[in-house]
Amino acid sequence: MDMKKMAGAAVLAAGLLLGGAGSVWAAHLEDIAARGTLRVGTTGDYRPMSYKDADGKYEGFDTELAVKLADSLHVKVEYVPTTWKTLSADTAAGKFDLALCGITRTFDRERTLAMSDGYLLFGKTILCRKGEEGKYKSLADLDRPEVKVMVNPGGTNEKFAKSRLPHATLLIHEKNAEIPSLIAEGKADIMITETMEARRYVRMNEKLAAPLVDKPFTRSRFGALMAKGDQDFLNYVNFFLAEMETDGTMDALEDTYIK
């Protein structure tokens, strides 16, 4: 085969591959409709975004947002449990259509997966025991060997603690929802968390305080997490989030779960 024919064959093959890939991904929304459910990955341990109530029912800002996303697709929600440690791998493996449970938008996640447009501005802060607020006025006050910092594994809290508090004593606890109570009981000194979670636990537990909640160490937004390659579905989720912002739904959810 001469060079011109080889080049032509290569172009044709590439076109067929691209066309095939496009048709596969274009069918993803159709698959959700045919299945009748939107599979939503959730850790179920992050107040006020996605958590379980006393009866084991999922609640929270992102939980309700997931229901509204499913409603827009005329299907029901099917929650699929995941953990912060396995979140990225489970997303890439296609165990659910998207994850929606208070997931911070990060460059690392965007490089390997797909993240939606951002919503809700927040930042990293701390929870400590009430009465000890005066001990923690800056990162320098936290970054000491005698300060026991507790975080859950695999998420941005652990990453923040390891990168910004290298001299503190780091304690890893598997269940994020248990950490605030452990702080209140004196099992650790501080919890690294986000501003909205800190505010929620301070309201729930009179033994806790969040002295730096109005001066967070970082500024971020949440996003829905999906596997790479499904541009049609990503476009739809981004359109949905924009509409929720425009029609006031985001403000209403914030009033209900965060303020």
Give residue ranges: language-model regions.
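Extracytoplasmic small-molecule ligand-binding "clamshell" domains
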Residues: A27-G102, R111
